[in-house]
Amino acid sequence: MFDIEIDPTDAEHAMFTTGFGGWETFNLSAVEREEPVKWSIMSAGIEETVPLELYAPEKGARLISGIGDYGGFTHFDLNRPDSLGSHANPHFGNTNGVTGAWLKQDLVVRVGTLFGHQPDAKTISYSEDGGRHWTMCATVPTEKSRNGHIAVAADGSSWIWIPDRSKAYLTRDKGASWQVCRGLPKNIRVIADKVNPKRFYAVDAVAEILYSSEDGGATFHADTLNLTVKRSQRGNAGAAVRRGDLRGGQDRIYATPGREKDLWIAAYDGLYHSVTSEKFDFRVLDKVRTIYAFGFGKAKPGNDYPAIYLIGVINGQYGFFRSDDAANSWVRINDDAHQYGLVLHICGDMQEYGRVYIGTHGRGIVTGVPAS
């Protein structure tokens, strides 16, 4: 419950709000007679929807979503609800992580929190048909493992799961067994290279440390970065200060689809790109000042580099942006009348150039296409 109010003009009428919508009664005084008070939902056909993760494959479903409270959905048709409903086997309340094997597109893995009473269910599940049907993993790393984020090797051969406030765990047998990844701190987000199944990456943007693995995630090595933008990096005595919203897409590392070791660091206060084949050498993109969300989409016809989408501040202006030339130039794709409140996630459609998905905090997933 977030709030409760009694109508100042009608003592029988009261309302309270929850994440599931508003409720109201018109017989509040029944409680004084020790009789039941009848409450009814005020929403009709709508519900607060909070996307927690967006994953757009190159084939099959257009989008696979991780949702707060309702698990998530596989969106084959963007114009109508999928007949399969929310993801099952098991049903999650929250799906905090969902991703797939980039070179084996039918394999998708999700992690989250169980919904309701499912005593034998696990908090990780996978699909081998692009998100239509799901199989629970046989085990989880520890009995407390839930939520967090999942990374899947490009060929699906290994998965790395970092549950909430936990070490990173590796499985090579679809969750039948797990081992601790060596060389990683707790509670760090890991991603997979989109081409080389042996490569995984993680970044601590505040400490300026890049972690990389070349053995399929078993061992990580740390490299010190030199990120040149340092606004709002640390507070007194070196304590980390708040950098945007931890649920958003900032202070994360991203791997470019179709390109090995082509990495982006979307720091809260700057965008960095590294394409050096021998070592990690990140250069700053000067126009980007603040980042809240970052993602890729299908390349513009005639281009061989994916479109890049970003929510943040570029050249002093907040907005949703797309770049068709590897972040050298940007076009704003929204206007001041379409900002949708708190927005923490963005990704492009990998099957249709220009289509973009916006993850709002309570207003669902917004999709848009170029006006012309």
Regions found by a protein language model. Give the residues of each.
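Short glycine/acidic-enriched loop and turn motifs that connect beta-strands
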Residues: 21-23, 71, 114-118, 166-167, ...
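Surface-exposed loop and turn segments in beta-propeller and other repeat-based domains
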Residues: 1, 43-44, 141, 225-244, ...
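Beta-propeller fold detector
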Residues: 34-43, 83-87, 135-139, 179-183, ...
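Conserved Ser/Thr-centered positions that define the repeating blades of beta-propeller domains
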Residues: 25-27, 72-76, 125-134, 153, ...
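Conserved blade-ending motifs and adjacent loop-strand segments that build the rim/top face
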Residues: 38-54, 89-96, 229-233, 286-295, ...
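Loop/turn-rich, solvent-exposed surfaces of beta-rich toroidal or solenoidal domains
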Residues: 2-13, 17-22, 53, 249-275, ...
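Structural signature of eukaryotic scaffold interfaces centered on beta-propeller domains
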Residues: 1-9, 52-59, 96-106, 148-155, ...
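Blade-level signature of beta-propeller repeat domains, shared across WD40, Kelch, NHL, RCC1
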Residues: 338-372
